[in-house]
Amino acid sequence: MSKSPVAIIILDGFGKRAETVGNAVAQANKPNFDRYWADFPHGELKAAGLDVGLPEGQMGNSEVGHTNIGAGRIVYQSLTRIDKAIEEGEFQENKALNNAFTHTKENNSDLHLFGLLSDGGVHSHINHLVALLETAKDKGVKNVYIHAFLDGRDVAPQSSLEYLETLQKAMNDLNYGEIATVSGRFYAMDRDKRWERVEKAYKAIVSAEGEKFEDPIELVKASYANDKNDEFVVPAIITKDGKPVATVKDNDAVIFFNFRPDRAIQLSNAFTDKEWDHFDRGANHPKNIKFVTMTLYNPSVDAEVAFEPIEMKNVIGEVLSNEGLSQLRIAETEKYPHVTFFMNGGRNEEFPGENRILINSPKVETYDLQPEMSAYEVTDALVEDIKNDKHDAIILNFANPDMVGHSGMLEPTIKAIEAVDENLGRVVDLILEKGGSAIIFADHGNSETMSTPEGKPHTAHTTVPVPVIVTKKGVKLREGGRLADVAPTMLDLLGVKKPAEMTGESLIQK
């Protein structure tokens, strides 16, 4: 039977900004997007800060964006939740955190804090690290060591010195805590199974393998001199009196303070997996450690969780399933968890009638080397699916504007957007031919801002609104929309009643 599918099409990191300088979105040749913008109802959506359950002024990100999109409501994000717990004193009494503290006291062992050292608020926040230091000291933990992962991606590429100084000041004020290792997130936070990267971070933390420095600041400066920005700092060891400050040993406790799971899973697995074959963990692999993660990273990570997920009922996938509608989720590796796990409110399993297609992302060092990524392959698979009348609803993500946008390089990002536009045309024209419709929009900004006002590369997400197009003639879109309104709009286009849990509203004016 012929289907007229309704699609959610996410152009990841494709923000809306009037200024064209350093704006890959504005500079790209994108005839298909421009044609849909001219022909169909369009507007903009808020995709940052309070509108997606983040603190005011906080840039949006893919995890948060897809969670809000799928939920059809504003979802209180981990960052906001943990901030609130610290403010209200719940953090200090958190069971999992206190279990880690107790473990070190019972075993006369050390506490190690792993995580991304920045205030980017995408994966972690430095304030949470400072709160952990204060709490551990308050609870009588003797020694605490920090294994700092440098950012340079959700914040400026060379900003780690200020975060190291902030951390140093907090430790000086408390007279407590030391930095033991430093590693760029490229190594410690890989998510693409490039185990040789994770191995470097792991071996620095466990076996003190790597270059040695007495001062983290010197380490970073040496890395800059070597043309390696924060993200790419090779895992290195901090020493005192010629010896490593600390390694993770038998009976120690670890708290991984990243709250976003995807880039914390692999390193956590390296510490917690009983069965392991990705690299040789060596004789120093620590036994009997208490491993605590800030949020639930993945069922594969054997750890206690400080902030368990809040279960969400009636997300888009569940509603479609309950209505007996078939649905497809499709993306390449980099954004596959977003259209599945995050879109389903933190649930790994498919709903009945939900199918998934994963297309592998290209194995290149950085995506500016292959700006088209796997957009053509994703589209080939989807076109085939639509032609065969497989699904009533489609959720598609094009990763390129975000993933290439993170390089801070304008030209490759323009190419990325042009590749996406070509494929967007193939998908949307086919959907229209089938009598279906698409909601085309972004989950957050990035590629519209490729340079800072000083002309330096800008690699982070932004707080700008994102464009939205609904490819249906004869309707009007209301103003003031946000990401939480996308799922209700999809249901509206499908003629399905919105459940009470979805507090977002359809963008289509009644």
From Swiss-Prot:
It comes from the Bacteria. It catalyses: (2R)-2-phosphoglycerate = (2R)-3-phosphoglycerate. Mn(2+) 2 binds at residues 12, 62, 443-444. Substrate binds at residues 123, 153-154, 185, 191, 260-263, 335. GO terms for biological process: glucose catabolic process; glycolytic process. GO terms for molecular function: manganese ion binding; phosphoglycerate mutase activity. The keyword Ion transport does not apply. Mn(2+) 1 binds at residues 402, 406, 461. Keywords: Glycolysis, Isomerase, Manganese, Metal-binding. InterPro entries: Alkaline_phosphatase_core_sf, BPG-indep_PGM_N, Metalloenzyme, PGAM_B_sf, Pgm_bpd_ind. It holds the Pfam family Metalloenzyme. Pathway: Carbohydrate degradation; glycolysis; pyruvate from D-glyceraldehyde 3-phosphate: step 3/5. The active site is at residue 62. CDD domains: iPGM. Binds 2 manganese ions per subunit. Belongs to the BPG-independent phosphoglycerate mutase family. Monomer. This is 2,3-bisphosphoglycerate-independent phosphoglycerate mutase. It comes from Listeria welshimeri serovar 6b (strain ATCC 35897 / DSM 20650 / CCUG 15529 / CIP 8149 / NCTC 11857 / SLCC 5334 / V8).
